[in-house]
Regions:
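Secreted/periplasmic carbohydrate-active enzymes, especially glycoside hydrolases
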Residues: 1-204, 334, 442-443, 447, ...
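Active-site neighborhood of glycoside hydrolase catalytic domains
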Residues: 224, 241-327
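Active/binding-pocket-proximal capping segment
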Residues: 224-227, 235-236, 456, 533-536, ...
Length: 650
């Protein structure tokens, strides 16, 4: 609808390439009429200063006070995670009161996988001269230093979160509204979704600018789980004529949301918009120089001015993607963040990710169909074909079904049923993202963020999500649990897929090799052993060996490259496993030297049985991408390849 972005409703309500056109009307959040007789708390701002192992916590309380209401005091109580209390009482002067806490042994807040997430309870009471409480405020505070490092380095200008002095490799996904009818979203639903993120080893999440500012409980849960929040302001894929009335409206919007959210430990940065700098720079969407000037005013003057006044310790980024603003090459691979879509929209192969050393990838993705049970929720049996009217209406990206089938033709034999097509599409999605994330983690330091588009759906639909509308994990979410693991072993293989753009070409002179890498995203050195084997389809071993592994904290190490060019292309595969010093399995995987559709798989003779809470699966041969269908909506502890071994799935 023309002008819909000026309504300050979620842009995606008016249709997106994963969501329906279902705009709402009216006020959808609670409205309160507050009255007071003497004074009330108008605003509270908490500032942190970290120095030499201590933290100074300054609480500034601004009061709204009737002229003749007398003297008021503010009592601030800080309760540590262990229950210890500190109290400071301050008398207001000219409508302001300040309380300061100095913590000599602070418990610091860390992102998921880097440490704990201790939260301090800060309680503020406004008391009159008789000690009667007139107003109150209660929040959870995490103690941390958090910014974005943009230091110059050998690759250009880095872009990474730095938390308590530690540079973090961001791993996560982009969050869109959880329901097209946003009043249906509940704290329990959001908690389940975000817990699924933490369970898959996410440490970050991007709130995309085409939706809405989530409720307080969203950020409370992120604080508890250690999920760093990249927070877009709510502008996406549009331009504006900046009138005085619109400027006044959006400025009030900025102030309201910054004040509401700034105390959260998980809030990592504010970002001006989604993809608008990039497309305005390309001359798209804009119809006049005035609109281009208004863009600069909105995102490089108005928002920074609000943040300087309301949240001066926050990091602001003008757009995503961006290299720093002012239309200066927003997709520069040597600085800032990028959205990379040549895999999928550009139809380039998965291996193309390996050609790029971005600094921070805030969007890249691949579509798949939702789980079969989800498809059954909106189709009759006669509709269960991806080109049926109903199925096409649940695919909002017009050319996407064709793209899925294009990539399918490169990798797999044509599925014999819709259920197998769903399975194959989810494997394609998961493996595409695996190529990208594993590559960028192998180049930690140059790249410091891999954020997948997208996390979730707002209705039952074919999309880029890793969790569908009903909360069912697609294959991608299981893969994310593996390739976002704190310690990751991965393999850069060379074979047909990496050397031939046409997988049907004869592979004369083909290089076949395996190059293992171990990425350690923990705060401790990792020591262990990498075991490898070259195997036949029945899982029998042709060659095997091992490498001793030592990986410093927060780094990635390459192991020696191995050449297998003299072995068969279609009947050998390479498997690998990482063990710690105690012999415990840390990670594993396998690679082929050809497209899976051409590999000469043997019957693995799969067998599965249930024992207590475990599903035990055995295989006598190589079984790749085994899916367990439990007959109920359950999340399994693992889904994996089998090499002729026992696998336990809880």
């Amino acid at each position: 609808m023309k002008g819909c972005s000026h309504l300050r409703k979620p842009h995606c309500m008016f249709g997106w390439d994963w969501g329906p056109q279902l705009p709402d009307t009216g006020i959808w959040r609670p409205v309160e009429l507050c009255a007071f007789s003497g004074a009330r708390i108008a605003d509270i701002r908490v500032k942190q200063e970290h120095c030499a192992g201590t933290v100074s916590l300054q609480t500034e309380v601004r009061l709204e006070q009737l002229a003749s209401s007398g003297e008021y005091a503010v009592c601030c109580t800080l309760t540590s995670p262990s229950g210890d209390e500190l109290c400071v009482r301050s008398v207001s002067a000219e409508g302001m009161a300040t309380a300061c806490f100095v913590l000599e042994s602070p418990q610091l807040w860390w992102p998921n996988m880097y440490g704990e997430q201790p939260l301090y309870a800060l309680n503020v009471e406004l008391q009159d001269k008789d000690g009667q409480v007139q107003d109150g405020w209660h929040k959870q505070i995490g103690l941390r230093e958090l910014t974005v490092s943009r230091d110059q380095d050998e690759w250009g200008e880095e872009f990474c979160f730095r938390v308590n002095g530690v540079k973090i490799f961001a791993m996560g996904a982009d969050y869109v509204p959880e329901d097209s009818v946003i009043t249906r979203v509940t704290p329990e639903q959001t908690q389940r979704l975000l817990k699924d993120c933490a369970a898959a080893n996410f440490n970050s999440i991007r709130v995309w600018g085409g939706g809405y500012y989530p409720d307080d409980f969203f950020y409370d849960i992120c604080d508890e789980l250690g999920l760093l929040v990249w927070q877009d302001f709510m502008f996406a894929c549009a331009v504006y004529n900046l009138t005085d009335a619109f400027e006044e409206n959006i400025t009030a919007e900025f102030v309201d949301n910054v004040r509401r959210l700034r105390h959260h430990a998980s809030l990592a940065l504010w970002c001006g918009n989604n993809e608008m700098e990039q497309f305005v720079a390309q001359g798209e969407w804009v119809t006049s120089m005035r609109q281009k000037a208004d863009y600069i005013k909105m995102y490089e003057y108005i928002i920074p001015k609000v943040l300087k006044a309301e949240d001066p310790q926050a990091f602001y980024w003008p757009a995503s993607p961006s290299s720093g603003g002012s239309f200066d090459d927003p997709q520069d691979p040597t600085r800032g963040d990028v959205h990379y879509w040549m895999v999928w929209h550009g139809l380039l192969p998965f291996t193309d990710y390996r050609n790029h050393q971005f600094r921070y990838v805030s969007e890249f993705g691949f579509q798949s169909f939702p789980c079969t049970e989800t498809i059954e929720s909106f189709t009759a049996p006669e509709d269960r074909n991806v080109f049926s009217y109903v199925m096409e209406k649940h695919q909002r990206n017009a050319s996407a079904n064709g793209r899925i089938l294009f990539y399918l033709s490169q990798m797999y034999l044509y599925p014999r049923s819709l259920e197998l097509l769903v399975y194959a599409s989810q494997l394609l999605q998961a493996q595409a993202m695996q190529y990208g994330v594993e590559h960028w983690r192998r180049h930690r330091g140059c790249c410091m963020g891999a954020v997948v588009w997208q996390l979730n759906d707002c209705w039952p639909v074919a999309s880029w999500a890793s969790i569908d509308y009903f909360g069912r994990w697609k294959a991608l979410h299981y893969y994310e649990k593996r390739f976002f693991a704190p310690v990751l072993i991965s393999c850069h293989e060379e074979g047909i897929l990496s050397q031939n753009t046409n997988v049907n070409a004869e592979p004369f002179g083909l290089k076949k090799s395996a190059h293992l890498n171990v990425s350690n995203e923990t705060m401790q050195e990792f020591r262990g052993k990498a075991k490898w084997s070259l195997r036949r389809p029945d899982a029998s071993v042709i060659e095997e060996g091992s490498f001793d592994v030592t990986v410093p904290a927060l780094s990635a190490v390459w192991l020696p490259e191995q050449d297998f060019s003299n072995y068969g292309t279609y009947d050998t595969y390479y498997s690998y496993q990482l063990l710690d010093e105690a012999g415990n399995g840390v990670g594993e995987g396998s690679v082929l030297f050809c497209a899976p559709k051409h590999f000469r798989f043997a019957d693995p003779e799969l067998n599965a049985f249930v024992k207590d809470d475990d599903i035990i699966v055995t295989a006598k041969g190589y079984a790749r991408s085994v899916e367990i269908q439990a007959g109920a909506d359950v999340v399994l502890s693992e889904q994996r390849d089998l090499f002729g071994e026992f696998v336990y799935l809880h």
